[in-house]
Each structure stands twice: as structure tokens, then as C-alpha cells.
């Protein structure tokens, strides 16, 4: 069994519905990770398709973005890189399932050609995107068992506990969060887009917002406990920058 695993996480600002652009950024980061001998690499939720804009799309437009996993053109670009660089690579997309429904999915491509897909258990992004119904835990070539929970899946303590009980030692937790329009009086709230637009002129202001109660501060209230309480490592990945009317942190 491997006693050490070099893991890395990526943040980038995706473009809405521009899969080719997003994949080009993903490929660039994979090459950089390979130079640093990364073995497990996590990208954010729905990083291939874009995220928050999908709520404005029609059912047909969501389906047009979706891809069947077995014949996914996007994953056909990622899987050979996992094999070439001996790396496990996790990416988010919209899956068109065999049942004809769409899913917020996270695909982990392994260097031996294996592919493991988690469907978000608590999907809310669009009425055409269904929720998954099972946990995802799998073995890796390094003797480490990995689980996946997408964004809000991690908010519920039972999901992480169930994933740990299935043997997960590392939890990949891809997100698109920060600066959200939470309806809870105790949840995070939007970050002014003007701060992001002026990030070059006033980097201290946007950094303070990112680290504050509507960004990292909110996550640090609860996310580390998921790892601590279940005796596992948590690999968090998030988008960054403007995402429709919100600002990711």
C-alpha cells in the first residue's frame, strides 16, 4: 500500500457552455501537474460545461451540453492524459445517462483506463438535471481508496460518513461555491461583482472577500470536520471568479 500520495487541486474560471475552451485550460493544468509528479488531480464541479448559467437554459439546451459517458468526446481528451502521465484525473460535466436523464456528474479517469463516475446526490441546478442515487468509492493503482461527493453532497454529514464506511481514505470534493445566494440566514451571501472586476486595481479587497464569511470563512466552519470526523483526507476543488450572477471563491 502506498503511504504517500501526491495530490493537487485546480481552480480556474470556466466559460459558460464553452467546452472546448474549458478543456484547453484543463489540459494545460494536467500537463503542469505532470511536471510536478502529481498522482491525483481534482478539477471543479461541472468545469467542462460551466455551471451556474445552466439554470437559464431550456431542457433541450441542457441535453445538448450533456454527453454519454461511454462515448464522451470530452473524456476522450482526458483519459489518454491519465494514462500518459500515470495520474488519476477528476473532471465535472453533465452526463446523459443510459436512462435518458441528465446528471451533474464527476468522472475520475485512472491511468489503467478505468473510469469511475459519481452523480451528484442532491442536484438543484436545473429541473432537467436529475439526482444520483448511490455513493461512489473505488480503488486506485496506489492502494488508496477514493470517494467522490459533489458540492452540496458534502454539506450533509451522513453522505461523508457513508462514503467513509465504504472504505474511502481520500474524498474528492469538487465544488462551485462561494458568494452564493443562500436562502439560509446563516449561509453565505453574494460577493459584489465589482470587487472581482477591480481585482487588478484592488487585490486586497477581493482577497478579503474570498477569505471572509461568504467564501473560505464559511467553508472552514464545517468542511474540515468532514475529514476529521471520518478519518480521511479531503481534496477540495472550486471554481473562481464570475459565474453568471455569483462570484466563486
Annotate the PLM regions.
Residues 7, 22, 33-57, 82, ...:
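Active-site beta-strand/loop signature of hydrolases that rely on acidic residues for catalysis
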Residues 15, 151-156:
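Glycine-rich phosphate/pyrophosphate-binding beta-alpha loops
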Residues 1-7, 137-147, 168-170:
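Beta-strand-turn-beta hairpins that frame and shape the catalytic cleft
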Residues 11-30:
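N-terminal phosphate-binding loop and adjacent alpha-helix
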Residues 70, 74-88, 155-249:
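CN hydrolase (nitrilase-like) catalytic-core segments centered on the catalytic cysteine
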Residues 58-61, 106-111, 189-191:
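Short, hinge-like loop/turn segments at secondary-structure boundaries
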Residues 10-17, 58-66, 143-146, 202-211:
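Short, basic, glycine/proline-bearing loop/turn elements
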Residues 64-149, 153, 228-249:
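Catalytic-core segment of enzymes that process non-peptidic bonds
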Amino acid at each position: 500500500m502506498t503511504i504517500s500520495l501526491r495530490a493537487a487541486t485546480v481552480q480556474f474560471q470556466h466559460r459558460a457552455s464553452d467546452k472546448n475552451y474549458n478543456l484547453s485550460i484543463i489540459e494545460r493544468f494536467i500537463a503542469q501537474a505532470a511536471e510536478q509528479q502529481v498522482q491525483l488531480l481534482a478539477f471543479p464541479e461541472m468545469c467542462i460545461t460551466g455551471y451556474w448559467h445552466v439554470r437559464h437554459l431550456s431542457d433541450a439546451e441542457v441535453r445538448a451540453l450533456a454527453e454519454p459517458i461511454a462515448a464522451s468526446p470530452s473524456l476522450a481528451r482526458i483519459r489518454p492524459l491519465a494514462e500518459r502521465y500515470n495520474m488519476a484525473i477528476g473532471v465535472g460535466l453533465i452526463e446523459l445517462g443510459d436512462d435518458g436523464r441528465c446528471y451533474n456528474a464527476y468522472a475520475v479517469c485512472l491511468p489503467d483506463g478505468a473510469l469511475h463516475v459519481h452523480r451528484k446526490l442532491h442536484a438543484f441546478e436545473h429541473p432537467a438535471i436529475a439526482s444520483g442515487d448511490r455513493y461512489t468509492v473505488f480503488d486506485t493503482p496506489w492502494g488508496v481508496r477514493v470517494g467522490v461527493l459533489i458540492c452540496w453532497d458534502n454539506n450533509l454529514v451522513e453522505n461523508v460518513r457513508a462514503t467513509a464506511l465504504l472504505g474511502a481514505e481520500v474524498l474528492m470534493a469538487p465544488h462551485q461555491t462561494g458568494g452564493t445566494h443562500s436562502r439560509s440566514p446563516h449561509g453565505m451571501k453574494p460577493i459584489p461583482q465589482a470587487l472581482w472586476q477591480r481585482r487588478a486595481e484592488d487585490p486586497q479587497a477581493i482577497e478579503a472577500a474570498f477569505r471572509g464569511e461568504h467564501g473560505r470563512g464559511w467553508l472552514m466552519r464545517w468542511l474540515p470536520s468532514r475529514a476529521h470526523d471520518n478519518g480521511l483526507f479531503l481534496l477540495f476543488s472550486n471554481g473562481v471568479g464570475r459565474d453568471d450572477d455569483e462570484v466563486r471563491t
